[in-house]
Amino acid sequence: MADSSSTSAFISTLIIYGLTAVVFVWLFLLLRPKNRRVYEPRSLKDIQTIPEEERTEPVPEGYFGWVEYLLSKPHSFLIQHTSVDGYFLLRYIGIVGSLSFVGCLLLLPILLPVNATNGNNLQGFELLSFSNVTNKNRFYAHVFLSWIFFGLFTYVIYKELYYYVVFRHAMQTTPLYDGLLSSRTVIVTELHKSIAQEGEMQMRFPKASNVAFAYDLSDLQELCKERAKNAAKYEAALNKVLNKCVKMTRNKTQKQLDKLYNNGTKPKDDLETYVPHKKRPKHRLGKLPLCLGGKKVNTLSYSSKRIGELNEEIHEKQADWASNDRQPACFIQFETQLEAQRCYQSVEAILGKKNFGKRLIGYSPEDVNWGSMRLSSKERHSRRAVANTIMVLLIIFWAFPVAVVGIISNVNFLTDKVPFLRFINNMPTFLMGVITGLLPTIALVVLMSLVPPFIVMLGKLSGCVTRQETDLYSQAWYYAFAVIQIFLVVTATSSASSTVDSIIDRPRSAMTLLANNLPKASNFYIMYFILKGLTGPTWTILQAVNLLLSKVLGRVLDSTPRQKWNRYNTLATPRMGIVYPGIEILVCIYICYSIIAPILLFFSTVMLTLLYVAYLYNLNYVFGFSFDLKGRNYPRALFQIFVGIYLSEVCLLGLFIMAKTWGPLVLEVFWIVVTALAHIYMKRKFIPLFDAVPLSAIRHARGEPGYSYPTSDLGLQEIKDIADEMKGKYEQDNTHGILTPVTKDDLKKANLIPDNDGSSENGTPSNPFESGSERASLSGSNAESDSIKKLNDTVIKKSSTLSSSTKDNNESTFVPEGEKFRKFHYSDVEALRNKRPYDEDDHSKHGPEGAVPVNADAGVIYSDPAAVMKEPQAFPPDVLETNTWTRRILQFFNPRRSYPFDSVRMRFPLVFNTSIEYDEEYLSSAYTDPCVREKDPIVWCCKDPLGVSKQQIQEARSNGLDVRDDFTRYDEKGKVIFTYNPPDYEPEAKK
């Protein structure tokens, strides 16, 4: 058998990857000060898409001053500046990295001598692995240390799941999340036909303020897509010809200009002067590409007229959208989170399991996959089955190239039986190390990088209701894919290739030989961890792709004001469902080999430490916030750690069987049973609490006397009792119904009043859900009776613990006494105050005293000035000063004392003080397909000094198309410049 190449591969890999990492870090330090938009965009004041609370301070001076600066910040700082999802990602890396370090301290001093001495005298890293042991009694050290190490992992998983549940419950009771529209809306899908009516749902949930159903709006959706496509083409074509006009006149002599204008007979502001009609941009109609498409048309004239026609068609369908077929999904809105949680926790008991598919809470209208709303249970299950089948087939076929990678990692063992590979034996040691260490690790990274986009696409096609569900679907399948390919396939092929000679000679002992050589596969993962630990983090902070897009491709590809604005103001956002599995598989590998080849723990510790630092920088300074998953990837990642524990235990079991060591075998079987029982217990205890918030927790946070957080079981029993209580009330209700004022929309459906066109002058459809002040009487008279008027004067108002008009005994435990909003006293905040988005004399908006108001797409956002100004009190410390190290160590083994509800809540940043007052018009139609509320497009072109843009604006306006050149100009080089936001830009309020 050939000798192991682990030492030469290790040295070659370490040198090459080490030098690569040094180059990446050097480039990062060199380029960062001169390219702040690439390396610290979150600190720039002129990026409009970053709310002030999320903006970070500039990177501290010094090459690595930011490391100490960020590591010294409390968790509250990270929650505010990296988002809840970013915070839990960092926490996950920190937790598993710390456990890897503990494993080094616990396992290496014992297992390395046990493995290395008086064994099989193997070479290289194999000397330090399980396969070098010959004395069967030594295996007791492995089994008992596996108990300790895996037991520690299991307890930490339990402790972190406990923390996550308390964190979620505390977060949901903060002023921000308590008042969100998504926190007050329950989504129920796949409803049975017998209850898919507003009246049926109102009858079962009488405290609902609004019940909205999804509708089949496929025709309207197609029209909106066509309009958006034409608007994009028109905007690109218009800016293209304007750029050409400016280019034709820039740096021209008077003689050349006279020739261009034909001595004054051609107007300067006419596009025909510069670009004749026949030479203007054209495109083909239809969906087929290039010459296979339909008729070729002038883009400017055709799109302008077509958009005007589409505007009229869309307005008609938007005004009459409720007449379409209803879909089996409804959105039940409540005035408070308390009632929404009561509904969410009792939906299954009241409706029955067979009468609906899924119940969801905490998802905004933007989160909903509206195309999935029409699916019935059978259709959704069929889609999921098809998507899962495709994933299984992908895993099977992807195993072949990955298997080649595993074989290459131990290719030197195949030279005796594969003649054409014998030339490898004549290679220098360093080159052999490159082939067996460098080449397979790079190939594996490339192969795995091709998979995520496909998995995300399958998630969307599988019938996921929300984009969060799609993300969690991607996380589950990408992790499964990685475990099978990176661990199982590579381990099997690598160990098989190293034993092929012996298997051919002794086929009956193939299983024993494979088991004994399984630890040799750890050599590949040492190289893989070096790659991930050295080049991974340094490549991440180098931001080479963003640098290329910003400095090279952006300047070539972006020619319109909107393209340039998007390039500058749009930040990259991490997709957590893809980021997590990439780290989880590394954790799985080091757990699996922690007992078999413990030396791997040293490399995993270094790798995870560097990954933590890299993500700490990027999440604070580079990445923007993605859609809000509320940290849901974190508990899934914790549960998926059990995969690594099970695999490690099964591998040890197989090794003990092959070694015929029955004592360690029985002990390992016992621990597998303990692990499985702990896993089942945690799933039953914690998963039902991820989205359900105990009502007592909400009331306790509001300061209602007699309520406290249910620490004993985190509210699990209370949630079950609420379901039984609500079911009992519904069954005892004799009337099974409620009386509500009739709306004009109801009267139109009943043909009692004419269905007039409700479109407004600006093309925005009338409100499909009438607000309280627009209720109509059944009598047909314009005057309403006093009793009806009293009912109709009710308006949904946002109640906030930050308001100066809070009720007695309603003091939030979130904001301590004396820490209410203060008066403005900083110049920056004074500037915000002067730009108050609403009239000082208009009392229709009642924000908290001293709050910083900002107009947004769905209402007004009121922020805490301390959070906006990054004042020290905005970031509470992690641990009270009275907590000594001894006390903290003791509390580690008692999650109830480590994470009491009130303490966790008080540690949140003051950004959770934010309050949002939604517009009534938005609230009434929030949970409808976005195409119902979609506004007419605004084309944004660059203002040229010739006046051509103004002429084109007038021409487009005659066709019903809104074109504007606000906040744009050409610089002295003839390049497009934007000076402010697009005319259709609005800051987004959290929903």
Swiss-Prot record:
Glycosylation sites: N115, N132
Polar residues bias spans: 757-785
GO biological process: phosphate ion transport
Membrane-spanning intervals of the chain: 10-30, 92-112, 139-159, 389-409, 438-458, 472-492, 524-544, 583-603, 605-625, 638-658, 662-682
One cellular component term from this protein's GO annotations in UniProt: endoplasmic reticulum
Region (Disordered): 749-787
Subcellular compartments: Cell membrane
Family: Belongs to the CSC1 (TC 1.A.17) family.
Protein name per UniProt: Phosphate metabolism protein 7
Source organism (scientific name): Saccharomyces cerevisiae (strain ATCC 204508 / S288c) (Baker's yeast)
Gene name tied to this protein: PHM7
